Amino acid sequence: MRFKGLDLNLLVALNALLSEHSVTSAAKSINLSQPAMSAAVQRLRIYFNDDLFTINGRERVFTARAESLAPAVRDILSRIQSTIIKGDLFEADRSERVFRIISSDYSTSIFIRGVISAASTSLPLLRFELISPDDNCHDLLNKSEVDALIMPEIFMSSAHPFVPLFEEKMVCVGCARNHEDRNISSIQEYLSMRHVVAKFGRGMRPSLEEWFMAENGMRRRIDIVVQSFSMIPPVIQGTERIAIMPYRLVEHFSKFMPLKVFALPFPLPRFTECLQWPSIATPDLGNRWLRAYLADHASQMMILDSAEYSGASI
C-alpha cells in the first residue's frame, strides 16, 4: 500500500530500526527475515535520499534526517495503534491488556500494590508490568513504550500531560532502639548527626530533600548513599544514623522494624506524586480507563489516610 509514493509498510520497518538500533534486532521485532529487513532499509534510503545511518566501529550512528523522522514515525504508528487497531471499546473486566507503568519503590509500596491487589480481585484478566524509573524513563514515555509514569511532580516531563495523584510529606527517621530517648532540638544538632541519603538512577539524582538542604545552606555529614528510599530503614537499623524519607513509606516499614520519627526544628518539604502518560495515548480508551482507575484509588487512599496523616509519630 502506497501513500504519495511511500510504501506505508516501510514506516514499520523504519520505526523498528530506530528503536532497536540494529538491523538484526529490528527484523526480529517485526518478524521479518534479515534479507527482507535489509531490502526495506535500502528502499527507505532511496525514498528519503539519505543514508539514515552509518557504522562507526560497532556503533550504528543515525543521521540527522533519521533522528528527525523518529518522533513523527512513532507518533503515526502509535496513533494507528490507539485509534484504529484497538478499536472503540475497552472493557476492563474482559481485557487481557498489559499495562506498563514506571513506578518507584516508594509509589509501588504505598500505592500501586493496592491498585494491583484490587484489580486482581475484580479484573483478573488484566496484567501489569512495573518498571523501575531510571535515567531513560522519559525516553520510554516519548516512544510510547509505557502507559504511565508515577513520580514526584519535579520529575515530570514538560512534553506530556500529567495530573496530581496525592501529596506526601517528608519526615526524619531513625532506629527506635538507638534513639529511644533522643530528640533533635536544634538545626546544629541535626546537621552534626550521621546521615543516610537516597540518590536515584545512574546519574545519582538528588532527592527533593537534598535540593531543600542545598537551597537553605545546610551541610550534613553523609555516611551512606543508597539508590532508593526502601533501602534506608534496613541501613539505619542498629545505628545512630538518621535519614529523611516519605512518611507513608516510614509507616509501611514500621510494621517490620522499629522506626522513630523525629520532630525537627525546621519544616521539611512536601511533594506531589503525579501521574503522567504519553500525549498520544490521551484518547486511547484503555489508557483513559487506567488514568481514572489510578486517580480513584489515589483519592480513596487520601480519604483513608486523612485522619492520621497530620501526625508524625509512629
From Swiss-Prot:
The keyword DNA-binding applies. Residues 23-42 bind DNA. One of its GO terms (molecular function) is DNA binding. It comes from Azorhizobium caulinodans (strain ATCC 43989 / DSM 5975 / JCM 20966 / LMG 6465 / NBRC 14845 / NCIMB 13405 / ORS 571). This is Nodulation protein D. InterPro entries: LysR-type_TF (IPR050389), LysR_subst-bd (IPR005119), NodD_PBP2 (IPR037416), Tscrpt_reg_HTH_LysR (IPR000847), WH-like_DNA-bd_sf (IPR036388), WH_DNA-bd_sf (IPR036390). NodD regulates the expression of the nodABCFE genes which encode other nodulation proteins. NodD is also a negative regulator of its own expression. Binds flavonoids as inducers. The keyword Transcription regulation applies. Pfam families: HTH_1, LysR_substrate. The gene is nodD. Disulfide bonds: none annotated. Residues 6-63 form the HTH lysR-type domain. Keywords: Activator, DNA-binding, Nodulation, Repressor, Transcription, Transcription regulation. Belongs to the LysR transcriptional regulatory family.
